[in-house]
Swiss-Prot record:
<keyword id="KW-0408">Iron</keyword>
<keyword id="KW-0560">Oxidoreductase</keyword>
<dbReference type="GO" id="GO:0005829">
    <property type="term" value="C:cytosol"/>
</dbReference>
<comment type="subunit">
    <text>Homodimer or homotetramer.</text>
</comment>
<feature type="cross-link" description="Tryptophyl-tyrosyl-methioninium (Trp-Tyr) (with M-249)">
    <location>
        <begin position="98"/>
        <end position="223"/>
    </location>
</feature>
<dbReference type="GO" id="GO:0046872">
    <property type="term" value="F:metal ion binding"/>
</dbReference>
<dbReference type="GO" id="GO:0070301">
    <property type="term" value="P:cellular response to hydrogen peroxide"/>
</dbReference>
<dbReference type="InterPro" id="IPR010255">
    <property type="entry name" value="Haem_peroxidase_sf"/>
</dbReference>
<keyword id="KW-0376">Hydrogen peroxide</keyword>
<comment type="similarity">
    <text>Belongs to the peroxidase family. Peroxidase/catalase subfamily.</text>
</comment>
<feature type="cross-link" description="Tryptophyl-tyrosyl-methioninium (Tyr-Met) (with W-98)">
    <location>
        <begin position="223"/>
        <end position="249"/>
    </location>
</feature>
<dbReference type="InterPro" id="IPR002016">
    <property type="entry name" value="Haem_peroxidase"/>
</dbReference>
<dbReference type="GO" id="GO:0004096">
    <property type="term" value="F:catalase activity"/>
</dbReference>
<keyword id="KW-0479">Metal-binding</keyword>
<dbReference type="GO" id="GO:0042744">
    <property type="term" value="P:hydrogen peroxide catabolic process"/>
</dbReference>
<feature type="site" description="Transition state stabilizer">
    <location>
        <position position="95"/>
    </location>
</feature>
<feature type="binding site" description="axial binding residue">
    <location>
        <position position="264"/>
    </location>
    <ligand>
        <name>heme b</name>
    </ligand>
</feature>
Length: 721
């Protein structure tokens, strides 16, 4: 470990000072240190494409109809190395798409199909994703053919949608525009368990206590355990899990039944063999396996002998066509528990008619019992789900429509507003879960609006805080939130504690009048007021600047807003305004780091924003924590100057709070939180703080602050990209 080349005879001929797969990392030595890696993902060093490559422009050149035609052909082009069940890959492709999109959760907007992350660990090796590597490999010739014009993320979702079309479903539509990532995400918390299918994510016995933000019951599953809670069949208990997990994916009861039934109308489960004979998952597989996992090198392991979930059988009589057979079998037969050949619990019908049995995947002369999982039986046993299932059974057209819409929602939920959808099949209808915003006016007198704002009695802190609060809800994970729409003036945002409702009401009354007078949207005026505040603050510090501004934001209405769906965007903490709603188990600086990542900011952008906001008087409820200046309202680098000044000493006072005292005299000069002090204690953040504290970087500080501020204000302006 001394950085020298090891002996070529008895040692490893690698310079061990440069870590590859071995060695002790910094996080192993200092596990409690603030890990900034989640802010430094997906940069040009990992991306093989040219710096000016723009997928969203490239995909517009795609021959959409030719691609869809090729996907239709793929569905029935069975390959000997991985033969299609009944000669149709539809079920496999749908499962791939479902499991990509189904990892999304509303709490933080992470997961989902928007990045093509199923290609990488851990998802490519999850127990719930067994053999989906084969689906992606089957798609490779099409990806190879269309190249840069189609991302893996788009192709994975489109394949499932085309699969449904090829089996007779009229789909609701499709939007292209998902951009690929090139390495595993570092910011997604999948759970703390150290083993697959671990379930240490509940607080006691209540199934409602599933740890936030998780939306799956066990490590490595997408939703629920198909055999039952912790592998023990009990449809009513499983119904609780289904309701919680689908709810955390923003699905209501009707959408949940539709998705469960529609997903199981086609395809089958695979468990006709010994699961112990499967090889390692893709990440652990041997190099000669070329990224494929779960290979059975002992027995046949394909076709009718495939093992995936361990459950064995199809749900319906005709698993390659869209019909109402799922409800027919589920509701008309009694079911009993059986074990699959692989030893998994499954439900099979009692006294089923021979003609209602699906045929064997290879020999149509052989028929097998259909099966139901414990989650399927929940659709029959839970009274609410049962009522919905019976309606779907009686009205197949209604079921098909509800499912098509729910499938579209499932596969597009993390794409953000409809303006981001690309292609000829984008539905014209605006859906409330897309958080629609009307187009805003761009042709008003911006200078006149700024003059009216400057002449108002609003303070710099009031203007900047309101703009920040409006914009900070943006999540790069699912492209929700942000300032466009000015939903800060609507329920529930106007009443959030973090938005200081009393102060907000006062500011909005003034800004709404200015919007009316000038023809601007309230959304634009809110951001413009923040910019005016910053320009005033910079002038007070001796710098004349113009903060960039792009008009065109619209104002959403209550009718365009699903108020309940915005609850998950409520800030319960904001390190930028030095505020915690309450004390949490997670350290304040880690909470800020998570929020920073969701906003799409880097570590140095986080640093300069905190330092600037502290001196502008933007702390929540006007607290003085971290306000290391006697020139509040002037955009100075005082925060960094005083943070790095060794004439000061930092003394804990109470939980997460500190006093800054003169090292010699001992008098209290300022107070601070952990969020303030981390910029001097963390070695990386301190290196940034020192840059901004330098005498020659006062101008750079303002320049970088304005750039980071503008990035936040425009984060949801997809029309500017």
């Amino acid at each position: 470990m001394d950085g020298k080349v090891g002996s070529t005879t008895t040692g490893c001929p690698v310079i061990h000072g440069g870590m590859t797969s071995t060695g002790t990392s910094n996080t192993a030595w200092w596990p409690n240190a603030l890990n900034l890696d989640i802010l430094h993902q997906h940069d040009t060093k990992t991306n093989p494409m040219e710096k000016d490559f723009n997928y969203r422009e490239e995909v517009k050149k795609l021959d959409f109809e030719a691609l869809k035609k090729d996907l239709h052909a793929l569905m029935t082009d069975s390959q000997a190395w991985w033969p299609a069940d009944w000669g149709h890959y539809g079920g496999l492709m749908i499962r791939m798409s479902w499991h990509a999109a189904g990892s999304y959760r509303v709490a933080d907007g992470r997961g989902g199909a928007g990045t093509g992350n199923q290609r990488f660990a851990p998802l490519n090796s999850w127990p719930d994703n067994v053999n989906l590597d084969k689906a992606r490999r089957l798609l490779w010739p099409i990806k190879k053919k269309y190249g840069n014009k189609i991302s893996w993320a788009d192709l994975i979702v489109l394949a499932g949608t085309i699969a449904y079309e090829s089996m007779g479903l009229k789909t609701f539509g499709f939007g292209f525009g998902r951009e690929d990532i090139w390495h595993p995400e570092k910011d997604v918390y999948w759970g703390s368990e150290q083993e697959w299918l671990g379930a240490k994510r509940y607080d006691g016995k209540s199934r409602e206590s599933l740890e936030n933000p998780l939306a799956a019951v066990q490590m490595g599953l997408i939703y629920v355990n198909p055999e039952g809670v912790n592998g023990q069949p009990d449809p009513l208990r499983t119904a609780q899990d289904v309701r919680v997990t689908f709810g955390r994916m923003a699905m209501n009861d009707e959408e949940t039944v539709a998705l469960t039934a529609g997903g199981h109308t086609v395809g089958k489960c695979h468990g006709n063999g010994n699961a112990k004979l499967l090889g390692p998952n893709p990440e652990a597989a041997n190099v000669e396996d070329q990224g494929l996992g779960w290979i059975n090198k002992t027995t046949r392991g394909i076709g009718r002998n495939t093992v995936s979930s361990g459950i064995e059988g199809a749900w319906t009589t005709h698993p390659t066509q869209w019909d109402n057979g799922y409800f027919y079998l589920l509701l008309n037969y009694d079911w009993e528990l059986k074990k699959s050949p692989a030893g998994a619990w499954q439900w099979e019908p009692i006294h089923i008619k021979e003609e209602d049995k699906p045929v064997d995947v290879e020999d149509p002369a052989i028929r097998h019992n259909p099966i139901m999982t414990d989650a399927d039986m929940a659709m029959k046993m839970d009274p609410v789900y049962r009522k919905i299932a019976e309606r779907f059974y009686q009205d197949p057209d209604y079921f098909a429509e509800v499912f098509a819409r729910a499938w579209f929602k499932l596969t597009h939920r993390d794409m953000g507003p409809k303006t981001r959808y690309i292609g000829p099949d984008v539905p014209k209808e605006d859906l409330i879960w897309q958080d629609p915003v009307p187009a805003g006016n761009r042709a008003y007198d911006i200078a006149a609006a700024k003059a009216k704002i400057a002449a108002s009695n609003l303070t710099i802190g009031e203007m900047v805080s309101t703009a920040w609060d409006s914009a900070r809800t943006f999540r790069g994970s699912d492209k929700r939130g942000g300032a466009n729409g000015a939903r800060i003036r609507l329920k529930p945002q106007k009443d959030w504690e973090g938005n200081e409702p009393q102060r907000l009401t006062k500011v909005l009354q003034i800004l709404e009048d200015i919007a009316t007078d000038t023809g601007a949207s309230v959304a634009d005026v809110i951001i413009l007021a923040g910019n005016v505040g910053i320009e005033k603050a910079a002038k007070a510090a001796g710098f004349d600047i113009i903060v960039p501004f792009a008009p065109g934001r619209g104002d959403a209405t209550d009718d365009m807003t699903d108020a309940e769906s915005f609850d998950v965007l409520e800030p319960l903490h904001d390190g930028y305004r030095n505020w915690l709603k309450k004390t949490y188990d997670v350290r304040p600086e880690e909470l800020m780091l998570d929020r920073t990542q969701l906003m799409g900011l880097t570590a140095h952008e986080m640093t300069v924003l905190v330092g600037g906001l502290r001196v502008l008087g933007t702390n929540h409820n006007n607290t003085q924590y971290g306000v290391f200046t006697d020139r509040v309202g002037a955009l100075t680098n005082d925060f960094f100057v005083n943070l790095t000044d060794m004439a000061n000493v930092w003394i804990p006072s109470k939980d997460n709070l500190y006093e800054i005292r003169d090292r010699k005299a001992g008098n209290i000069k300022w107070t601070a939180t952990r969020v303030d002090l981390v910029f001097g204690s963390n070695s990386i953040l301190r290196s940034y703080a020192e840059v901004y504290a330098q005498d020659d970087n006062k101008g750079k500080f303002i320049q970088d602050f304005v750039a980071a501020w503008t990035k936040v204000m425009n984060a949801d302006r997809f029309d500017l990209a």
